[in-house]
C-alpha cells in the first residue's frame, strides 16, 4: 500500500454495472491515453500535412470511428487519398440510419489510432461515390487535423478486476463514472460502455476529477480530454478516453510516480 494517498475522498463513483469486461484487443492495449493537451502543438492545418496523415491511416488500414452531428456512429476506414483535389474516399456504411445521418450532416467527427497515437478531425457533408466497383463515400480534406504526440511517460495498465474508478462532476451537475484503464505521470486512460463522446467531447476540461485506486489511494485533479476512440462494434463497443492532467503540482507528481510503479508491479504480479 502507498503511504501517502493524496486528497482523500470517500465519495464512490456512480453505480455503473461493475468494471467493463476485460475484452481487450490489440488496439485497446496499444491505445495512447496520455497525449499532451489538445492545443496548437498537435494541430495540422497544411494540406500536405493532413494528406500525409490520411494516407498513413489508409496504408495502415486503421479503423476510424465516425460520429455525425445527430450522434449516429459507425466504424469505417480510409480507402484512397487524393492530395491534388484534397479529397479522400472512405468505406461505405450499410446501416441506413447511420448512412442517411452521415450524408445529411455538415459536421462529422472522425477519431482513431495511427500507430497507437490518437488522430481526430472533422469533415463536412460527404458524397456517395464508387471505389473498386463498390459503393463508398468521398469528402474534402478537413480544415485541421489533430495528431497527438506519443506519450512522454511510461504508462502502467490496471487490472480490470481491481475496479479502479474515476468520477467526474460536469458543470451541469451530471456525474460520470468511468473505469481507469491505465495511468502515467502525464495522464490517465478511461473507458466505459455508457459514457460516450457526447458526454466528453475531445477538448473538454473537467475540474476536480476524482481517481479512486482503492487501497493505493485517491487523487483529485483537473483533467482535459485529448482523445476518444471506440473498440468493438455496436452494443459491445467500449469508449476509450485519453485524458491529460492539467498542471499537477510537485507533490502530486511524486505520488503519481509511486502509484504508477505500484500499478506496474501489480500488473506483472
From Swiss-Prot:
InterPro entries from the UniProt entry: PilZ_domain (IPR009875), Split_barrel_FMN-bd (IPR012349), T3SS_YcgR (IPR023787), T3SS_YcgR_PilZN (IPR009926)
Family membership: Belongs to the YcgR family.
Keywords, alphabetical: Bacterial flagellum, c-di-GMP, Nucleotide-binding
Chain positions covered by the region annotation Disordered: 1-42
Subcellular location(s) per record: Bacterial flagellum basal body
The keyword Nucleotide-binding appears for this protein: yes
Classification via Pfam families: PilZ, PilZN
Quaternary structure annotation from Swiss-Prot or TrEMBL: Monomer. Interacts with the flagellar basal bodies.
Species, as recorded: Cupriavidus taiwanensis (strain DSM 17343 / BCRC 17206 / CCUG 44338 / CIP 107171 / LMG 19424 / R1)
GO cellular component: bacterial-type flagellum basal body
Lineage of the organism: Bacteria, Pseudomonadati, Pseudomonadota, Betaproteobacteria, Burkholderiales
Function summary: Acts as a flagellar brake, regulating swimming and swarming in a bis-(3'-5') cyclic diguanylic acid (c-di-GMP)-dependent manner. Binds 1 c-di-GMP dimer per subunit. Increasing levels of c-di-GMP lead to decreased motility.
Transmembrane region(s): none
Molecular-function GO terms, alphabetical: cyclic-di-GMP binding
Protein name, entry field: Flagellar brake protein YcgR
Domain PilZ stretches: 149-261
Acidic residues bias: start-end ranges: 19-33
Amino acid at each position: 500500500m502507498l503511504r501517502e494517498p493524496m486528497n482523500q475522498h470517500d465519495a464512490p463513483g456512480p453505480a455503473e454495472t461493475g468494471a467493463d469486461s476485460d475484452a481487450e484487443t490489440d488496439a485497446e492495449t496499444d491505445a495512447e491515453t496520455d497525449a499532451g493537451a489538445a492545443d496548437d502543438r498537435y494541430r495540422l492545418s497544411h494540406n500536405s500535412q493532413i494528406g500525409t496523415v490520411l494516407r498513413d491511416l489508409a496504408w495502415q488500414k486503421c479503423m476510424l470511428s465516425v460520429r455525425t452531428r445527430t450522434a449516429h456512429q459507425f466504424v469505417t476506414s480510409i480507402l484512397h487519398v487524393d492530395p491534388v483535389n484534397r479529397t479522400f474516399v472512405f468505406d461505405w456504411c450499410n446501416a441506413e440510419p447511420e448512412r442517411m445521418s452521415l450524408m445529411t450532416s455538415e459536421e462529422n467527427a472522425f477519431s482513431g489510432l495511427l500507430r497507437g497515437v490518437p488522430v481526430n478531425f472533422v469533415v463536412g457533408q460527404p458524397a456517395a461515390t464508387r471505389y473498386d466497383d463498390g459503393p463508398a463515400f468521398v469528402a474534402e480534406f478537413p480544415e485541421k487535423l489533430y495528431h497527438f504526440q506519443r506519450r512522454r511517460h511510461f504508462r502502467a495498465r490496471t487490472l480490470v478486476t481491481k475496479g479502479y474508478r474515476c468520477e467526474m462532476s460536469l458543470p451541469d451537475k451530471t456525474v460520470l463514472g468511468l473505469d481507469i484503464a491505465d495511468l502515467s505521470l502525464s495522464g490517465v486512460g478511461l473507458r466505459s460502455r455508457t459514457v460516450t463522446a457526447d458526454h466528453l467531447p475531445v477538448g473538454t476540461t473537467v475540474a476536480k476529477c476524482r481517481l479512486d485506486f482503492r487501497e493505493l489511494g485517491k487523487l483529485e485533479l483537473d483533467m482535459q480530454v485529448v482523445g476518444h476512440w471506440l473498440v468493438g462494434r455496436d452494443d459491445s463497443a467500449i469508449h476509450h478516453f485519453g485524458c491529460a492532467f492539467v498542471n499537477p503540482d510537485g507533490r502530486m507528481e511524486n505520488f503519481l510516480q509511486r502509484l504508477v510503479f505500484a500499478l506496474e508491479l501489480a500488473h506483472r504480479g
